[in-house]
Amino acid sequence: MAADSREEKDGELNVLDDILTEVPEQDDELYNPESEQDKNEKKGSKRKSDRMESTDTKRQKPSVHSRQLVSKPLSSSVSNNKRIVSTKGKSATEYKNEEYQRSERNKRLDADRKIRLSSSASREPYKNQPEKTCVRKRDPERRAKSPTPDGSERIGLEVDRRASRSSQSSKEEVNSEEYGSDHETGSSGSSDEQGNNTENEEEGVEEDVEEDEEVEEDAEEDEEVDEDGEEEEEEEEEEEEEEEEEEEEYEQDERDQKEEGNDYDTRSEASDSGSESVSFTDGSVRSGSGTDGSDEKKKERKRARGISPIVFDRSGSSASESYAGSEKKHEKLSSSVRAVRKDQTSKLKYVLQDARFFLIKSNNHENVSLAKAKGVWSTLPVNEKKLNLAFRSARSVILIFSVRESGKFQGFARLSSESHHGGSPIHWVLPAGMSAKMLGGVFKIDWICRRELPFTKSAHLTNPWNEHKPVKIGRDGQEIELECGTQLCLLFPPDESIDLYQVIHKMRHKRRMHSQPRSRGRPSRREPVRDVGRRRPEDYDIHNSRKKPRIDYPPEFHQRPGYLKDPRYQEVDRRFSGVRRDVFLNGSYNDYVREFHNMGPPPPWQGMPPYPGMEQPPHHPYYQHHAPPPQAHPPYSGHHPVPHEARYRDKRVHDYDMRVDDFLRRTQAVVSGRRSRPRERDRERERDRPRDNRRDRERDRGRDRERERERLCDRDRDRGERGRYRR
């Protein structure tokens, strides 16, 4: 009866436990595959009874959920963990002894479980904390890509703990099964051999004592494992924190490198998030049993932690190799560009060698743009004179342009010619109150650099020739010292659109022209380099014959042996053709005509002396003052022919003089004819005037006589009338 009442109480308690722990039991069975395995083993065993299976399931419930129900009273845990063994064939004293020993054993196990639960409860928040902080430190994009890493890791930790607890409970179940099987065999054999009951009892007591010792040893081993696990977990947490700090530093370095360089990183964020998700899944799949669980946990965590962005770089060698290849290609490209720029710099230094530098200030950007487009520049007459002198004396003259209030230099160019006047006008944008007549001539320039240079990059340069002021400060036409100007020009960014070879070619051509001596002691006059066959309009003017090209020989040419002057050609200065030089240069046209008219007729034509053995034909009287027509040359008669250049030069000069003479005669005849016509008319009028005067005088005299007669008649009438009135 007592046993039946005790079984009923145990059944009621089990029903209450089932009601309280129904839903968590389903959850635990979902996540605890060992419980199902244990159930299948128990169902397959024929030795176990139905009551034994129910006690096994009741024993698993509190063992699994003891973590969630820490606040349960000790009595409920004791009642849940009671082992119900069949009491057939046993006396009441034996049963009481077994029951007492079983209750003592359960108390000891409950105390061990409480200690373990308290330690695990205190360990759980500390364990979860670094995972939370680690998750906080992730980027928001990675958090969006792996939304459930925290839950998976927690589930993995709980699975590890449940696996360790289930291993302990499985050990207890094995012990209880052995104990129950021993008692079952004892109870089945009691009906046959009642005399052996005492021996079975002694064996059962000894087995119970051995089981108690084994349980205590297992509990001590579990405590040691827990302590070792706690120490290992603390070490792992410290290692995790250090690795997280290293990852943060590496990510910061990567960001800095991305900000500094323009090259984009080939690694994608998906790869980083993938590596992290791998670490989370590894953590969620981890499971262990017994004492090997902690070691496996440590190894797997280290392996999972090893998959970091740094390790990913090592694994993704193809991406890094391609990135390195692109960097090598970039280095090759930069080396070729560097070689071109080095060549450009060497040419620029050659152009700037022994040059003179002038600062050119413009009032607006339009004039500088016009100068860049047409390659010309105009300045005030004061600066024009200065630049012309510099062009004659220096190897190169460099103009550095700057627009006022722009804060930059707009480029620099080299003078390629002196200023010239009379060309096509250039429409400069002039400030208010300034006319184009105030500007000087037009310079031709060759641009060396059309790119800009801010003043901030030349702040360290000062001009010694402008009181050591910064080179940006200066008026229009301010000259810059050689070293300062060279450094300033080298600061400009290279302009690959400019071919410096053309500039160097013009420099060498100018130097050759400058080094050639000029005959007759005339001052050197430079002409801008022009294409062959192109001449300015003033080159066709008959009064500018001195601008035409001549063949100039060095002074020692006429003294060289074997040189004979042409006896037919005599050097005559025909520039002024008998007119005084001051009248020819500064006089008006009327003065020139008057001077030429007073000069007298030209001398009679004298042909060139003939060569020996040649007859001279007689001159026609018409050609006394005019050149005779060209005659055919006689055949070759053993003498040297006249040089073509000498013939051409003599003919050219003589033809020019003849044209001038004819022109002056025609103009003189026209002028004299215009003046003689009115004089003849006046003379004719003067001749006809005496006749007309006589007639007029006679008419006037007759009119005067008639008027006098009329006056006398009028007087007589007046007198007669006055005498009548008096009478």
Curated annotation (Swiss-Prot):
Changing G411I: Abolishes RNA-binding and ability to influence alternative splice site selection. Residues 199-254 have a biased composition (Acidic residues). Residues 355-492 form the YTH domain. RNA binds at K361, S362, N363, W377, S378, W428, D476. Residues 508-523 have a biased composition (Basic residues). Changing W447D: Does not affect ability to influence alternative splice site selection. GO terms for cellular component: nuclear speck; nucleoplasm; nucleus; plasma membrane. Changing K361L: Does not affect ability to influence alternative splice site selection. It comes from the Eukaryota. GO terms for molecular function: mRNA binding; N6-methyladenosine-containing RNA reader activity; RNA binding. Changing L387E: Does not affect ability to influence alternative splice site selection. The modification Phosphothreonine is found at T148. Residues 1-12, 50-59, 91-115, 124-144, 151-163, 170-185, 255-270, 524-564, 679-727 have a biased composition (Basic and acidic residues). Residues 315-325 have a biased composition (Low complexity). There is a cross-link at K96 (Glycyl lysine isopeptide (Lys-Gly) (interchain with G-Cter in SUMO2)). One of its GO terms (biological process) is spermatogenesis. It is found in: Nucleus; Nucleus speckle. It holds the Pfam family YTH. Interacts with SRSF1. Interacts with SRSF2. Interacts with SRSF3. Interacts with SRSF7. Interacts with SRSF10. Interacts with CPSF6. Interacts with KHDRBS1/SAM68. Interacts with TRA2B. Interacts with KHDRBS3. Interacts with EMD. Interacts with RBMX. Interacts with ZCCHC8. The YTH domain mediates RNA-binding. This is YTH domain-containing protein 1. The gene is YTHDC1.
